[in-house]
Regions:
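Short, histidine-centered active-site or binding-site loop motifs used for metal coordination
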Residues: 13-15, 112-113, 171
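Internal, conserved structured core segments that host functional sites
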Residues: 85-138, 159
Length: 302
């Protein structure tokens, strides 16, 4: 993608503030995610890779877009409803306006295509709403309508280990396999994955938790391995313990080369600093161009 498009990738440390992270943990997480991006192949020479909080223009656009975002539409966000249910004691304004900040992340660079998972498509639709609303109110065409760039049928939502939802840092430590997890950590997490007592009817539909395990296996295991356990499930002889042991070893083999690269990259402070500085400069140029147009349209001095 980075060789075919003018790509922007960022580390979303503003977004993480809704969970009130410890400052030292936040700093370490930013460094780790940057190393992970680089280890997975992002090239700071080919794309713009930056830290969200290094771009105050995003915060300004977030503020300006909030002036035309309505409480009712924000409360209808599926993600907001989920968070209210999951953490009723921490329903803060940042959670409510999360889609507006996501819109600012996208619109600050006037992005045309956004790599987005299916669970975030509602937020992309809200981004189009906010951008179009701004254009209409101020009689301008500053913001394009961004569309999903999701590789079509090749798109796979990586499921979590808890039996439902997606795999992600925000969903809980035990729900996700991190690229830098040690082999013993991966084994423990996978062996704790949710299962049931097993099928009793041949070729029965798989419950969500079981389908999740098969989806994970389809990502990291050989086709023959997947087929073996598919057949075992369909003829009701499957042993989930054996399946999870195999899945854990295949995950370890899949993540090990990346984990080694992450470790080496984290040790190279000069490389990390250079990547952040390069990305910050390129992101500032793009964001400043957008904000000039936005401020002029609103009537602010530029």
């Amino acid at each position: 993608m980075q060789y075919e498009y003018h790509c922007f990738f960022f580390i979303a440390d503003y977004h993480s503030l809704t969970t009130h992270p410890n400052p030292e943990n936040l700093k370490g997480n930013v460094r780790t995610v940057l190393a992970e991006y680089l280890a997975c192949g992002l090239d700071p020479e080919k794309c713009t890779l930056y830290v969200q909080s290094d771009l105050p223009q995003t915060a300004e656009l977030y503020l300006l877009l909030n002036m035309h975002a309505y409480v009712g539409e924000l409360e209808r966000s599926t993600t907001f409803k989920d968070k209210v249910r999951q953490q009723p004691d921490n329903v803060n304004a940042g959670l409510l306006t999360y889609p507006v900040l996501m819109a600012a992340d996208i619109l600050i660079h006037r992005a045309a295509k956004v790599p987005v998972g299916k669970d975030q498509e509602q937020h992309l639709e809200m981004t189009r709403t906010f951008g179009n609303r701004f254009n209409r109110i101020y009689k301008t065409d500053i913001f394009p309508e961004p569309v999903a760039f999701n590789f079509g049928k090749q798109l796979v939502k990586v499921p979590g280990l808890d039996g439902s939802g997606k795999m992600g840092k925000s969903e809980g430590e035990g729900n996700a396999i991190f690229l830098s997890d040690a082999p013993e950590v991966i084994r423990k997490k996978v062996m704790r994955a949710v299962t049931d007592s097993g099928p009793t009817i041949p070729n029965a539909p798989k419950p969500e938790a079981i389908q999740n395990l098969f989806t994970l296996m389809s990502i990291v295991s050989k086709p023959d391995t997947v087929n073996y356990f598919e057949e075992s499930y369909n003829n009701c002889t499957i042993r989930y313990g054996d399946m999870k042991k195999q899945l854990a070893e295949d995950m370890i083999a899949f993540t090990a080369p990346i984990a080694e690269k992450i470790k080496a990259t984290l040790a190279d402070t000069a490389l990390l600093q250079k990547a952040m500085a390069m990305g910050k400069e390129k992101a500032h140029y793009s964001a400043n161009e957008t904000l000039k147009l936005v401020r002029s349209a609103i009537g602010f001095s530029v």
